[in-house]
Amino acid sequence: PPITAEPQPPAVTPPAETATAPPPPPPPPVAPEPDRAAVQAALASVPCSTIEATLEPGGRVRLTGTAAHEELVAEARDKVAAVADVATVDEGGLTVAAAPGCYGAVRLERAVAAAGGAASMPELGLNKPDGIYFDQDFLIIQAAMPPGLGGHLYVDVLTDAGAVYHLLPEELTPDNALPAGGRIRIGVEAAERRQGVRDWQAAPPFGPAYMVAVASERPLLPGLREVEEPAAGYVDILLKALAETPGAKAVRVQRVEFRPRP
């Protein structure tokens, strides 16, 4: 019989090798977030401002609010940027709400501190301990030179309306020379009003104001100035005098507020 070939089993094809996918990359490290308390402390050190901070992912801090001057906006940005783990600061939400009285007082305080001001400050005692004066209230100040510093005492009120009032020296109280610790009373009550004595009363425009007492071993300004003048120009003049006049100096700022009578 014819020879019949045995059927062969089908060839077995080995399975194709499956390519192994590379492992996924590790997630990027999580950047540490700034400490909220540290950011708030940095903002609290910026004077004449009301600023809020919003912490966003990636160390971004967004600032909103107001400051009295462009320089204080920059100061807020720089102080927050210096906080650990702050990556960027967005100050686009900050606006300038001009407050020339507050800003002028801060400039004077900082100038005296930078020049190594005296260890003790002048004294400013108010007849309203809370510093709040309503329309037509009489303003009385017990001012004094610092202990250990005799010379000349200058007392001004800077308002956020942009004016400065010179309480000492002025035409009716021209002598501002005092010994160390020497005291002087500025202003009188209604019953004490008389010819030749200056009285000071709260009046519009209302709002915050800043009483500034500057003590200097030597005279700072020649002669007497008008009782009222623009604050910005006067602060520049006084800063120049502080920088150019030798001798010890000290400053105190007392915030007060003038309000309409309820």
Task: Locate each region found by the language model.
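Secretory-pathway glycoprotein ectodomains that are cysteine- and/or Ser/Thr/Pro-rich
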Residues: I3-P262
